[in-house]
Structure formats: structure tokens, C-alpha cells
């Protein structure tokens, strides 16, 4: 099965190997740290040639994701990969995320991450929500009730920028710990993940509950769900980096 051109995955080719590590590991390894039985990436010519220099074969990594997506669709019989947006929508269905198939992929990804964050906030007590808002530097929260604080956090996430990326990394890391048994390399930066302790528990509980239901549906979801979350987070990181570059260019004029 060859890579099917996918505009939503083309940005992966711009990333460094360190960025692609998490996606590679999601596609290749399971929770026990063992290779997935149906993974094809480590037997590929590209992997044998370049090893952990993932940036050299980002397209092959994208192809692997399309392959796992095809396990959830009838097109697998045809030997064709499935485009990322189709995989993402399928994942959103499993996670009971509201979305419009006709909207941009980035908005669907935002809805997916927002849903996980929203469910996490529902599981927190008032003090945890307040403390998280303080960590995220949300101002004037002293007189706000829990509902207003949760709404402020979700609004902050949807506004984009560094705080949105920070929240996305926290969510993605918690999901990875629950589903894969380990965190993401993206979450290694303490500046990004100071609020991690407030979300790990609730997110872990939610995903564990969801996982119990969807695990029966097929092993492909053990890959496509965390893979979509990682891709969404990597896209936010790219947007954040591009935004910083534009700011520097404007300042230098």
C-alpha cells in the first residue's frame, strides 16, 4: 500500500525527527512496549535505511497511519489507505465528539481536544479548576464560580496560541500515558506542562472509560485515537512556531 497524498498530513514533512518520535512510537508500539503485530513501519526500507531519523521518511510514517485507518473501513480490502480527515472523523465518532464533516480539519481536531478537556474539567473539583486557571494565568478569577472558570479555560483553548498548545500537550500526554503506558516526548518541557498534575487523573479516568467501550470494536482504534491526538498536537505546535516566526519578522521590519 502506497502513501495517498493527504494535504492534512503534508505538514509532517516539515517536522524534525524529535517531533515525529511520538507519532512513530504510537504507530509501532503498544502499551506493553512490544511492537504491534500488524505494524509494517519497522520492516520498511525507509526505516531500515534511516532508523530514528524520522524526518527522512515522514511520508512513510504518514502512510502507516493511513494503513491503520484503513483497518476501520471497507477500503482496506482494496489495499488503499484512508485520508487523515476520514480517520479523524471516525475517531470523533468513537469519542462522541460533535463536529461538522465539511469544516476544516483543524476545527475538527479542536473539537476533539476540547471534548476531552471539557470532560476533564467536569471531573475536577472547584479547587483543581481554580488552581489550573491560576497556572494558565487566567486573570480575575476570584469571584468566578466553577462553571465560569471551566468556560474560561475552554475559551482560552479555542483562542489558539501558546496556552492552547500547552493544554493540547497536557491532554495528549495524559491520553498517551493511559493508552500507551508512557508519556510523550513533547511533554518533556516543564514550561509546557506545569498543569499536568491537574489533568492527568481526570483525563486518564475518562479515556479509560471510553477505551473499555471502544477496545472491543477493533485494535485499529488503539492506534488511530492516540495518533490523531498526537497529529493534532503537532499541528498546533507547527502553527505556534510559525506564529512566532511571523512575530519576529514583523518586529525586525
Swiss-Prot record:
In Pfam terms, one family for this protein is Ubiq_cyt_C_chap
Task: Report the superkingdom from the record.
Answer: Bacteria
The text of the family note is: Belongs to the UPF0174 family.
Question: How is this protein named in the record?
Answer: UPF0174 protein HP_1588
The organism encoding this protein is Helicobacter pylori (strain ATCC 700392 / 26695)
Amino acid at each position: 500500500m502506497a502513501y495517498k497524498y493527504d494535504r492534512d498530513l503534508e505538514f509532517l514533512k516539515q517536522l524534525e525527527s524529535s517531533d515525529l518520535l511520538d507519532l512513530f512510537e504510537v504507530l509501532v508500539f503498544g502499551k506493553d512496549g512490544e511492537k504491534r503485530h500488524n505494524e509494517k513501519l519497522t520492516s520498511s526500507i525507509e526505516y531500515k535505511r534511516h532508523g530514528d531519523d524520522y524526518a527522512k521518511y515522514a511520508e512513510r510514517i504518514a502512510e502507516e497511519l493511513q494503513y491503520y485507518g484503513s483497518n476501520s473501513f471497507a477500503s482496506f480490502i482494496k489495499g488503499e489507505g484512508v485520508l487523515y480527515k476520514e480517520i479523524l472523523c471516525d475517531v470523533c465518532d468513537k469519542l462522541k465528539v460533535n463536529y461538522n464533516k465539511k469544516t476544516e480539519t483543524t476545527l475538527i481536531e479542536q473539537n476533539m481536544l476540547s471534548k476531552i478537556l471539557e470532560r476533564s474539567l467536569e471531573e475536577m473539583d472547584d479547587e483543581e479548576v481554580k488552581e489550573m486557571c491560576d497556572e494558565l494565568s487566567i486573570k480575575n478569577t476570584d469571584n468566578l464560580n466553577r462553571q465560569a472558570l471551566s468556560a474560561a479555560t475552554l475559551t482560552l483553548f479555542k483562542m489558539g496560541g501558546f496556552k492552547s498548545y500547552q493544554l493540547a500537550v497536557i491532554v495528549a500526554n495524559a491520553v498517551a500515558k493511559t493508552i500507551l503506558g508512557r508519556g510523550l516526548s513533547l511533554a518533556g518541557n516543564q514550561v509546557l506542562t506545569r498543569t499536568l498534575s491537574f489533568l492527568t487523573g481526570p483525563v486518564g479516568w475518562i479515556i479509560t472509560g471510553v477505551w473499555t467501550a471502544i477496545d472491543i470494536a477493533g485494535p485499529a482504534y488503539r492506534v488511530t485515537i492516540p495518533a490523531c491526538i498526537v497529529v493534532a498536537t503537532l499541528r498546533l505546535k507547527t502553527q505556534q512556531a510559525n506564529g512566532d516566526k511571523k512575530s519576529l519578522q514583523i518586529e525586525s521590519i
